[in-house]
UniProtKB/Swiss-Prot annotation:
One of its GO terms (biological process) is L-arginine biosynthetic process. PANTHER family: ORNITHINE CARBAMOYLTRANSFERASE, MITOCHONDRIAL, ORNITHINE TRANSCARBAMYLASE, MITOCHONDRIAL. GO terms for cellular component: cytoplasm. It comes from the Bacteria. Keywords: Amino-acid biosynthesis, Arginine biosynthesis, Cytoplasm, Transferase. It comes from Helicobacter hepaticus (strain ATCC 51449 / 3B1). This is Ornithine carbamoyltransferase. The lineage of its organism: Bacteria, Pseudomonadati, Campylobacterota, Epsilonproteobacteria, Campylobacterales. Belongs to the aspartate/ornithine carbamoyltransferase superfamily. OTCase family. GO terms for molecular function: amino acid binding; ornithine carbamoyltransferase activity. Reversibly catalyzes the transfer of the carbamoyl group from carbamoyl phosphate (CP) to the N(epsilon) atom of ornithine (ORN) to produce L-citrulline.
């Protein structure tokens, strides 16, 4: 059973194939109409952590693919009342075709997947946010910033690629970890700038750097945001205090004071660089109002691409796991 728990579950060709499915589904949705590839299929959506974008994009996505989504908060299932993960996983997976889980500890997700009889998708865990990275890479492709990519929907692009430089500014959290994964797999240059004490996990960095030997990528961990942004094609940030870190909010504001992506910082990047943020954004903290609402910002295109990226992930998983699908003309 092939799950989608981290990007490292897939190789370069598989990631690009998944992105291609997402691109094709987006094209169909905008120009032809949605096709019911997953007609009659049921997606269980388990939210131990609440979300706006994750719920709306997955629920809309499975509907557009012809299936049905079932929303389950921690109040709706016995996991919130002490039932073992393995019991919940075996029961739910016996009644649905696919499961998306948004949780805290990544180990909970891994245990759930190990007992599930259907594919499990990581909607977010404390360590990784892989669905967001598929949406981010999809956005990069649409903006012409990516490695060699020969999708027929973009025939004038991908002729050798741009060998992009991505600068991630801020907390070494699940978003940083997933960017590290993607750089190791696809082979681009990633620079992460975080305050001392807030860098990404060392084991995740080491594994990705080992992968870069084959992929040709570069991963640099820095403490200077301007150095990271210098000549970058993509500038990314995230909230300084993630869900569950509210008590650290004031402490983190002080630590990250020099890591706000504002107009001055963006001036160090390429003139045609784009700005990405997975949202929600806190204006005046990790990003200025001017950057978030400016011409370089692709944040709302990126957010909308969550829908198409996750449709691509679901359909790709259904195909490789040989889930019986309805023939669509």
């Amino acid at each position: 059973m092939k799950h989608f728990l981290t990007l490292n579950d897939f190789n370069r060709d598989e990631i690009l194939a998944m992105v291609d499915v997402a691109l094709e589904l987006k094209y169909e949705s905008l120009h032809i109409g949605n096709k019911p590839y997953l007609k009659g299929k049921v997606l269980a959506m388990i939210f131990e952590k609440s979300s706006t974008r994750t719920r709306v994009s997955f629920e809309s996505g499975i509907f557009q693919l012809g299936g049905q989504g079932i929303f389950l908060s921690h109040k709706d299932i016995q996991l919130g009342r002490g039932e073992p993960i393995k019991d919940t996983a075996r029961v739910i997976s016996s009644m649905v075709d696919m499961i998306m889980m948004r949780t805290s500890e990544h180990s909970r997700l891994e245990e759930f997947a190990s007992y599930s009889s259907v594919p499990v998708i990581n909607g977010l865990s404390d360590d990784f946010h892989p669905v967001q990275l598929i949406a981010d890479y999809l956005t990069m492709i649409e903006c012409g910033i990516y490695l060699t990519h020969h999708n027929p929907l973009y025939p004038t692009k991908g002729k050798g690629g741009r060998n992009p430089i991505v600068a991630y500014i801020g907390d070494g959290n699940n978003m940083a970890h997933s960017w590290i994964n993607l750089a190791g797999i696809l082979g681009f240059e990633l620079r992460i700038a975080s305050p001392i004490g807030y860098a990404p996990k060392a084991d995740i960095i080491t594994k990705a750097q080992d992968m870069c030997i084959q992929s040709g990528g570069k991963i640099k961990i820095l403490n200077d945001a301007k150095e990271a942004v210098s000549n970058a094609n993509v500038v990314v940030t995230d909230t300084w205090a993630s869900m569950g870190q509210e008590e650290q909010k004031e402490q983190r504001k002080c630590a990250f004071a020099n890591f706000c992506v504002d107009e001055a910082m963006m001036s160090y990047a390429q003139k045609d660089a784009i700005f990405l943020h997975c949202l929600p954004a806190y204006r005046g903290q990790e990003v200025s109002e001017g950057v978030l609402e400016g011409a370089q910002s692709k944040v709302f295109q990126e957010a909308q691409n969550r829908l198409h990226a996750q449709k691509g992930i679901m359909l790709y998983l259904a195909r490789i796991n040989k889930i019986p699908l309805v023939s669509v003309e």
